[in-house]
Amino acid sequence: MRMRLFPAIDLKEGKAVRLLQGRMEDATVYGEQPVEVARKFKEQGADSLHVVDLDGAFAGKPVNDAVILKLIQSSGLRVQVGGGIRTLERIEELLKLGVERVILGTVAVRNPELVEKAVQRFEEAVVIGIDAKDGLVAVQGWAEKTEIKALDLALRMKKVGVKHLVFTDISRDGMLQGPNIQSTVELARLSGLQVVASGGVSRLEDLRLLQEEANRGVSLEGAIVGKALYAGAFSLAEALRVVGQRSEGK
């Protein structure tokens, strides 16, 4: 299976930033204009975009909708959005903006019944985001660690009809140390869900390893790449070639 690559834009106060391990105080501004960042991704061959409304994640309410709408309209990319999405109304608002998929995180722990209703209503437009540290789920914009195992939550979500999952190892996010490939692959194998790997991709080799697992039949749907692109570790065009989304000559 050829993986989808999702270059990431994290929005804080309308700007494109990256955090270290989810800490708002450790935000680095990479682009005053997120729309320009998205256009550059598109020019390099992207067809998808991962957007996190960081203000929304911490405030629990929409903050950057105007920017999200602009990103969709100006880039033409297929956009998935996470951050502070905790009601059916909010999901509907985002889908009406033109968002392809919404990522539910905290609400999967706090209100699984809502997830079930969301899946019944919006089907595969609903993706669950599981953020974990040492195998345990974190919620509220990563500020609070629970005693729930990532796999247990994934299996619970599968029971209510969820098919897609974004898995982030918080300890790796923004650190450029490489993703926790073993945990990601294990979660995909044991849950049977389509898993998008997130957090820590730092080298093209990380993407090669993930793509090799996908080629072996592991249900790895894709990977989210953030800081490595902004830091210049590799280009998006190079990353797309590794997963076969772009030919060698392009």
From Swiss-Prot:
It holds the Pfam family His_biosynth. Keywords: Amino-acid biosynthesis, Cytoplasm, Histidine biosynthesis, Isomerase. Pathway: Amino-acid biosynthesis; L-histidine biosynthesis; L-histidine from 5-phospho-alpha-D-ribose 1-diphosphate: step 4/9. The active site is at D10, D131. GO terms for biological process: L-histidine biosynthetic process; L-tryptophan biosynthetic process. It is found in: Cytoplasm. It catalyses: 1-(5-phospho-beta-D-ribosyl)-5-[(5-phospho-beta-D-ribosylamino)methylideneamino]imidazole-4-carboxamide = 5-[(5-phospho-1-deoxy-D-ribulos-1-ylimino)methylamino]-1-(5-phospho-beta-D-ribosyl)imidazole-4-carboxamide. Disulfide bonds: none annotated. It comes from the Bacteria. Its main location: cytoplasm. GO terms for molecular function: 1-(5-phosphoribosyl)-5-[(5-phosphoribosylamino)methylideneamino]imidazole-4-carboxamide isomerase activity. InterPro entries: Aldolase_TIM, His_biosynth, HisA_bact_arch, Isoase_HisA-like, Isoase_HisA-like_bact, RibuloseP-bd_barrel. PANTHER family: 1-(5-PHOSPHORIBOSYL)-5-[(5-PHOSPHORIBOSYLAMINO)METHYLIDENEAMINO] IMIDAZOLE-4-CARBOXAMIDE ISOMERASE. This is 1-(5-phosphoribosyl)-5-[(5-phosphoribosylamino)methylideneamino] imidazole-4-carboxamide isomerase. The lineage of its organism: Bacteria, Bacillati, Bacillota, Clostridia, Eubacteriales.
